Amino acid sequence: MNQDLSMNANQLVAFLQKPTSEFTKADIISFIQQKDIRMVNFMYPAGDGRLKTLNFVINNQAYLEAILTCGERVDGSSLFSFIEAGSSDLYVIPRFCTAFVDPFAEIPTLSMLCSFFNKDGEPLESAPEHTLYKASKTFTEVTGMEFQAMGELEYYVIAPDTGMFQATDQRGYHESGPYAKFNEFRTQCMSYIAQTGGQIKYGHSEVGNFTLDGYIYEQNEIEFLPVPVSQAADQLMIAKWVIRNLGYRYGYNVTFAPKITAGKAGSGLHVHMRIMKDGKNQMLKDGVLSETARKAIAGMMVLAPSITAFGNTNPTSYFRLVPHQEAPTNVCWGDRNRSVLVRVPLGWAAKTDMCTLANPLEAESHFDTSQKQTVEMRSPDGSADLYQLLA
């Protein structure tokens, strides 16, 4: 058994003993047959930023092979505003590397994200997912490097206020229960997201915490690990779908809205980025920010208008981007500064083995911490067109 995969929460990874990037059609069919999966879902992001779903009952193996190979027709004009009804048919073709067992389905169901294709069987050039794919591919072809990203997904949970163990207003950062009321909900979300293939770094309660008209509003965050940029967008789409579905199950209202009310913390979707080559992080050189990293930051300064257009699509986005709320208000960058457009966070650049200092019985590990350095784009929020933003 591959020890790197033995603890993976995705059932297909555990069963097939291979990473998702190596999934084949034969793997999908084998898993469906041996795990008695009865339904297949095709899922795809539409212009409104939400995942759409097409359900299939598995009649026999021939039918299963047909839908996995040929996909299905959909009405593009009902999915995207830029497609006219007069010529709107599109194909959706599943991407096997995105397969996961639906954690909410009562009937055993395998779900996959899909790509859009036009009438000629070519990728739909205007599809946001394909735009990101092209940008990522071009970046690698031009630079010989890989662009990776990870998101910090912030959201509010809203439920009736019990009046017990009141948290301090706007002091909810990393709060524990019973002052933080929705830790169990967040950890269940994290478990389900991991089962769908999401690579999670951690979760915690966030700054925003207040009561209004008999309801408690508690802000939470789930942060991911850096992965290839297209995968980063996919897992954020699925994560939002998981959080909304679980909120519905619990009877909670969940919102990714950038701003709920003035004077309270808004919710962002900060994006961390790093550039990789031959498995090595290119963001540091000799313990300081590399020329490659500085060029990337300069590019983000130049592209700030486009980043804002795709990252802040709701009018309430701009009520969040105000001073004294840990939100950027100027096109600039800085070390450890949460008020800039691009922050350079702590990156374990010091040559100190903190683990041995905290745990005297441990020998020095010589752990390679250079992989950890990222730069963080802080302006986007939950209204973002994820694929266009990351492109």
Q: Model features per residue range: what roles?
A:
Residues 176-180, 209-212, 227-234, 257-264, ...:
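Alpha-helix capping and helix-loop boundary segments enriched in small/acidic/polar residues
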Residues 1-210, 227-241, 252, 382, ...:
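ATP/Mg2+-dependent ligation/transfer catalytic cores
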